Amino acid sequence: MIVSDGPAERRQGALRVGTRGSPLAVAQTQAVSAAVARATGFDIELVTVTTHGDTSRESLSELGGTGVFATALRDALRNGECDLVVHSLKDLPTAPAPGLVLGAVPKRADARDTLCARDGLRFGELPEGASVGTGSPRRAAQLRAQRPGLDIVDIRGNVDTRLSRVSAGDLDAVVLAAAGLGRLGRLDAATDFFSLSTMPTAPGQGALALEVREGDERGRGPIARALAAVDHATTCAATTAERAVLAGLEAGCAAPVGATAMIDDGLLFLTATVYRPDGAAQLTASHAATPDSFGAAHLDEAARDVGERVVAELLASGAADLAPLKGLR
């Protein structure tokens, strides 16, 4: 049973799951909670937390990007207001959080970006000068690299707010994550999908993260059982490799960096690209690693190894001079 928006006090036997209050955050937290409930039989109580990123109207680059959606959730977890919290993994800082650990990463949804355009237009059909909205410096740089003649507009707001700007004629299109549209039942709004090879997405995009207090992930307690019920080893390895790029570059999530990792035929492949904000230049590095096994420890080791090699190549090629990378990690 899922109980939404309950008080911070624990209901007898209920597992309290913290979430942001946006429709997308609630939808994805409900999906994870339902999976935990099915696997464990636990009652789940959602605890809604308002974050600075939800209330501020500044752009992500002005806010500093990383941590604006995570800090309040982490505070609620440390204060005992909830037993675990659910983040969009792409919004979770890569630097360790004192007293907290990343306990589980469920199976990733579609990691691609989508175009949601007026009149069903595909990306190549947008006229010169068409206005395309995005709040992501990475997406803005990628769009400029592919179509320099587009008018890229910095926007904020939830999925419905962004889509409404297209339907109202304020914008010709917006770029949104396929995973978010799917979780909200709005994938029909997508008029085109960008391939990961031409438009690599934010490290961790499409994946969720379950964060807990340090120690709660171990043993056979209810929190550890909940984590084990939804953790997906290959998603965890792929996103660990992607996030190792951000960590190694000392970059925040507002940095114009795209990364894609996948496991195929026994190899863990990672490709990452750093973009100049105007889209006029970019650097790409790709490497692969062979895990000793597909156990969690060996996958994690391979992910960190391939991430370090990709970062080393990017930095040696001048990535730090190409784009503003520094940010809270």
Swiss-Prot record:
GO terms for molecular function: hydroxymethylbilane synthase activity. Its EC number is 2.5.1.61. The modification S-(dipyrrolylmethanemethyl)cysteine is found at C253. The keyword Cell inner membrane does not apply. It catalyses: 4 porphobilinogen + H2O = hydroxymethylbilane + 4 NH4(+). GO terms for cellular component: cytoplasm. Keywords: Porphyrin biosynthesis, Transferase. It is an enzyme of class 2 (transferase). Binds 1 dipyrromethane group covalently. It comes from the Bacteria. Belongs to the HMBS family. The porphobilinogen subunits are added to the dipyrromethane group. Tetrapolymerization of the monopyrrole PBG into the hydroxymethylbilane pre-uroporphyrinogen in several discrete steps. Monomer. This is Porphobilinogen deaminase.
